[in-house]
Amino acid sequence: QSRALLEMTDIRFQQRNYVEAQGFYSRYNQSARQNARSLWLGVQLARIFDQQDEAASYALLLKNIFPASAEYKAYLDSAR
């Protein structure tokens, strides 16, 4: 179930349906452990909804837990 929630988050995000993406992401967060992909989605959604503290928290987790991931590299590129 948690994988399906993350997939739906990503699909809605790609469709620019950010409100639904946020809803799926919230449900995902309640049921699953974070991975690099979910943290990067969390950063992007938090930025869209101007939740700076949340974006920073997800970014820090991404940096500390998945520093070699493609998602962390994408985060670094987006911060430039």
Residue ranges and their predicted role:
Residues E7, L41-Q44:
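"A position-specific structural signal for the A-helix of alpha-solenoid helical repeats
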